[in-house]
């Protein structure tokens, strides 16, 4: 009798473990959302397996990879644990392709200021168009995927962060990009890992943006922390954007890492996951009007270079 009881107890325990493992399984599906000449653009959807059969619509994180508009992968292994974390928190995560226009351009064509400025603008425009097409694809499948199209959060790393921020900037200024999306659409929030906005002249916001979460190191030599300007065209970094948001009293969460470079384009996906969830729960889904700035100080980096020139940024991005 005793042995039988132990056997039954062990069987029940194994069944419970199997149930938990099954409940935590992440389902991944890949879809083609656009074909543009030689480029077939795909996206990967991640969702908790036990949420697929639910009835409640879920918020979505639309992620764009980094890679300097020269490369990168939507399924980079370094991103997957971040996607799974968000999926377990109740989000549908969509990681999208976009065309990387700088990969096929001879570096000699953008080695000078004007050439670099022109090539970068074209690459950003192309990436943002594809990001918008991925957004439309999600909206078109919102019923089938059981997602809430009013709760799509744009997210990106480095070049992908520029893409996500630029998409929001274009919507707020009612440009031709906004016409590609449904009427009155806006992202519910943006999470930027070392991003910037590309604008001719100082950025202007016709409409206030959605809540923004901006991670940036003030020693970043790849994407400017504050700004990098070539005549009229400039890349306006997280610090500059945050100053504008503060004046407009628009909700934001700005995370500054002093003495840190471009590693903030990926490290928050591991080190700041709960900060990200707090932003999503409070400022995005909870619609709290908060202006939050967190400064990470490192005593070991008391002396560091942060006054980069436009030439410094060009050299770094031509590697």
Predicted regions and their residues:
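Short beta-strand element of the alpha/beta-hydrolase
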Residues: 56-68
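C-terminal catalytic histidine-bearing segment of alpha/beta-hydrolase fold enzymes
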Residues: 246-319
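Alpha/beta-hydrolase active-site loop
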Residues: 113-144, 237
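Serine-hydrolase catalytic-loop signature spanning alpha/beta hydrolases and amidase-signature enzymes
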Residues: 68-71, 93, 137
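Primarily recognizes the serine-hydrolase "nucleophile elbow" in alpha/beta-hydrolase
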Residues: 136-208
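Short amphipathic alpha-helix adjacent to the substrate-entry channel of hydrolases
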Residues: 74-96, 103-105
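N-terminal cap/lid segment of alpha/beta-hydrolase-fold proteins
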Residues: 23-56
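The feature captures the conserved acid-bearing segment of alpha/beta-hydrolase catalytic domains
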Residues: 178-249
